[in-house]
């Protein structure tokens, strides 16, 4: 909820206010209080609203023909006993409870696409395939799977994720840890220039 402060820029964006039908955009403190009071079913409704708004604005100012998804997982340190928080990998605050959400952003417009809140004791690839399935389900019908690229760090590199993206015919760039078999395969690859 600390990142709500980034919405302050919308207070001065008359076009956005007109699109959503607000006389003025609420203050960050008001938004934070509102979001803290939401129950899970309200959060699901808010996600659906976000997806509908994205669909309505997707082709503006011109239709897109491709998408690039950036996957990320981040450790959110918590203080207190928040529901679902667990002690897990936490390089800055060892032993603290945290969340480890999965996030997907569309790179061209730096647009939030989908997110999933997970306990802190999960690794990056945990639940990545179902997460990607939801991300791809939100792609408008006019964009071919071959025009979708997925990028992720080494936490997402694994057999299940690679096989899923191959089956979906989506392109991908996943960082792989430098193990000897991977190095040997990389040396044997031919360079192919892409358009």
Give a label for each model feature.
Residues 3-19:
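DNA-recognition alpha helix
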Residues 4-7, 27, 31, 65-76, ...:
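Short, conserved catalytic/metal-binding motifs centered on acidic residues
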